[in-house]
Design a protein with these regions (language model features):
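Extracellular hydrolytic enzyme modules, especially secreted metalloproteases
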Residues: 1-129, 140-142
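Extended polysaccharide-engagement surfaces of secreted carbohydrate-active enzymes
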Residues: 27-36, 159-164, 171
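General N-terminal targeting signals
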Residues: 130-132, 153
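Conserved small/polar residues in nucleotide/adenosyl-binding loops
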Residues: 174-181
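Acidic Ser/Thr/Pro-rich low-complexity disordered segments
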Residues: 143-170
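Intrinsically disordered, low-complexity segments enriched in Ser/Pro/Gly/Ala and basic residues
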Residues: 5-8, 160, 174
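Beta-strand-rich binding/interaction modules
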Residues: 132-138
Length: 185
């Protein structure tokens, strides 16, 4: 039997339950998703862009972010569309029925990029302080890392992380640079 409850959020209004974010994160583990944060707490990982990292804390856990295109694919809910040649596609928001696109490294099929559109609608409404637009996620799949829940434990070799549009990995929290992360490629 597994039990899960909300965490307390310590803030100016006192100790309040954080909302459903942590429960959503833990249920997602039961469905088969790994942690995408650095379980050693030395690297960035996916930050607030993933429920399996800090996204469960969006809006104090009351509106955790939606699942990424990668996570939806991993669960078998919405497959990624592989882009194999130069083409033009329209990225509709995931929360409005859009799909994610996968661009594979021809030299290493376990390394690829996932492109998705994140907007402030549905579950992604909690991302309002972080900007919106195209999210580019770099994946360097390693079966052992995924099976052992160690995706991002090596700060110099992240197995799954977002690529900031401004090329600065400083956006761990809601900072003034946060909105720059998704605009453009």
């Amino acid at each position: 039997m597994t039990a899960c409850c909300s965490e307390l959020s310590k803030g100016s209004s006192g100790n309040q339950p954080s909302g459903i974010g942590t429960m959503c994160h833990e249920v997602s583990h039961a469905l088969g998703l790994p942690d995408e944060y650095d379980t050693n707490y030395t690297a960035l990982g996916m930050s607030y862009w993933s429920l399996m990292d800090s996204g469960n804390y969006c809006d104090n856990g009351k509106t955790p972010c939606g699942l990424t295109a990668y996570e939806r694919d991993l669960l078998g809910w919405r497959p990624l569309t592989v882009l194999e040649r130069s083409t033009t596609v329209r990225l509709r928001p995931l929360e409005a029925g859009g799909v994610g696109y996968k661009v594979v490294n021809e030299a290493n099929p376990d390394e690829y990029y996932v492109l998705e559109n994140r907007q402030h609608v549905g579950w992604d409404n909690g991302l309002v302080k972080l900007g919106h637009g195209m999210l580019v996620v770099h994946v360097d799949y390693d079966e052992t890392a995924w099976k052992n829940n160690m995706l991002n434990t090596n700060a110099t070799h992240q197995r799954m992380s977002f690529i900031p549009a401004n090329n600065r990995y400083v956006c761990l929290l809601y900072t003034s640079d946060a909105a720059d992360d998704l605009i453009g490629v």
